Swiss-Prot record:
The protein's name in its UniProt record: Protein Wnt-11b-1
InterPro entries noted in UniProt: Wnt, Wnt_C, Wnt_CS
Biological classification of the source: Eukaryota, Metazoa, Chordata, Craniata, Vertebrata
One Gene Ontology cellular component annotation held by this UniProt entry: extracellular region
Any one of the GO BP annotations: Wnt signaling pathway
Function: Ligand for the frizzled7 transmembrane receptor. Primarily acts via non-canonical Wnt pathways mediated by either Ca(2+) and PKC, or by JNK and dvl2/dsh. Depending on the cellular context, can also signal via the canonical Wnt pathway mediated by beta-catenin and dvl2/dsh. May also inhibit canonical Wnt signaling. Maternally initiates dorsal/ventral axis formation by a canonical route, which signals via lrp6. In a complex with wnt5a, activates the canonical and non-canonical processes involved in axis formation.
Keyword set includes Transcription regulation: no
CDD domains for this protein: Wnt_Wnt11
Length: 353
């Protein structure tokens, strides 16, 4: 019996290594933050990287601090984006040892893959523009003719370099011959990575700075810049809510992903996809990667996902009061400072039973 249990455990580990291993680099916030990144030997110290990622690390040591920064940003942004949902992305902090919510091809893992992919390319593109990387600089001057009243200038985010280096790093586990996992899981991971990068590309916009006497803005200098990560994460959250469950089946001479409920069409390049349905995340169940919602803060007056009715799954909630101190009765004095008083206010909070 013990031997059977050992075999089942080993099988689960092997399956997970092919699926969740592709985002194990998010665990670099644990061991990568303490590395100086000045020797190629440092790349061997990192857990969770496939050989191809280790080689990228050795060839691009200067890039690795951006990778660590991206891992931090991806975790933080995910938790902020889902703070009002039953699944609040808290499990991403377990990286590189993920729970089933992020290791079984779920809707949640689709979001995290897409966000992580977008975040790394975003971080690298911004690092180029800020002069943090010696291997790249500002983005290329746009080919389009500038409009009336503005000229191209400034230092735009280097999206081209960010996409090239970011995709090479995050897609490596799915393309590695030494990684485990099924062809289906590799395909959905690559697909969701690409969706994240597409949302990032779509966020590129023209940003401008005014020049002129007394702020008249007679001339504007403009450049192409990416929107901030919270905007990109919210776009991906919309895709998460409308994600498509897929199957991996033979179509003609090759296997491809098709929607499970509507398999008459191929999967759209713009939609997130997943293989396994998620639990409702109401009750704590480690086997499903659910932390439950007991003791989660809820909003009594909301009708959205953070409402006490939805967040608490109908179990009810407890109320308590809290005294907060905040600035009040602020006055501006010429010139140039503000003086405020401190006021106490009692607020009522609600937590799920």
């Amino acid at each position: 019996m013990a031997q059977i249990h050992h075999c089942v455990t080993l099988l689960l580990i092997l399956c997970c290594s092919g699926l969740c291993g592709a985002i194990q680099w998010l665990g670099l916030t644990v061991n990568g933050s303490r590395v100086a990144w000045n020797e190629s030997g440092h790349c061997r110290l990192l857990d969770g990287l496939v050989p191809e990622q280790s080689q990228l690390c050795k060839r691009n040591l200067e890039l690795m601090q951006s990778v660590v920064n991206a891992a931090k940003q991806a975790k933080l942004t995910c938790q902020m984006t889902f703070s009002d949902m039953r699944w609040n992305c808290s499990s991403v902090e377990n990286a590189p040892n993920f729970t089933p919510d992020l290791s079984k091809g779920t809707r949640e893992s689709a979001f995290v893959y897409a966000l992580a992919s977008a975040t790394l390319s975003h971080t690298i593109a911004r690092a180029c523009a800020s002069g943090e990387l010696p291997t790249c600089s500002c983005g290329a001057t746009p080919a389009e003719v500038p409009g009336t009243g503005f000229r191209w200038g400034g230092c735009g985010d280097n999206l081209h370099y960010g996409l090239n280096m970011g995709s090479a790093f995050v897609d490596a586990p799915m393309k590695s011959s030494k990684s485990g996992g099924t062809q289906a899981t590799k395909m959905i991971n690559l697909h969701n990575n690409a969706v994240g990068r597409q949302v990032l590309m779509d966020s590129l916009e023209t940003k401008c700075k005014c020049h002129g006497v007394s702020g008249s803005c007679s001339v504007k200098t403009c450049w192409k810049g990416l929107q901030d990560l919270p905007h990109i994460a919210n776009e991906l959250k919309s895709k998460y809510l409308g994600a498509t469950k897929v199957i991996h089946r033979q179509t003609g001479t090759r296997r491809q992903l098709v929607p499970r409920e509507l398999d008459i069409r191929p999967v759209r390049e713009s939609e997130l996809v997943y293989l396994v349905s998620s639990p409702d995340y109401c009750a704590k169940n480690p086997k499903l990667g659910s932390y439950g919602t007991q003791d989660r803060v809820c909003n009594k007056t909301s009708v959205g996902s953070d409402s006490c009715n939805l967040m608490c799954c109908g179990r009810g909630y407890n109320a308590y009061t809290e005294t907060i101190v905040e600035r009040c009765q602020c006055k501006y004095y010429y010139c140039c400072y503000v003086v405020c008083k401190k006021c106490e206010r009692t607020v009522e909070r609600y937590v799920c039973k």
